[in-house]
């Protein structure tokens, strides 16, 4: 299995495992908000235009998330590009997703291969382009957020 699929599997399994631990702190039906950060390798950003990374994300990953949203597992997905570059933490794109609950993360990992097969009949092209997107990614990390009530 290529580097991307391995990384994706590890990320989803890792979130699923941590979901069991963190899920105990929240009710089962509480939405889960995760911020996914991407730092693009030098030369990968196109000033004033879309980056290759963004084009590949929109072509090969966003449709999968849209399908999960149609199925009710994801409540929202928003993509942000950093307007001003701070020194730390350095990131270029942030995706903020609100999942239905912790079990939605586990169900998504089960559904994903079937969704990829349905959306991308030429799996070799999809895998190659996702591999390229990850080659353009210098750093990636996720932050799982817990909302703190203000009242």
Please state what every model-predicted region is.
Residues 8-15:
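Core hydrophobic alpha-helical transmembrane segments of single-pass membrane proteins
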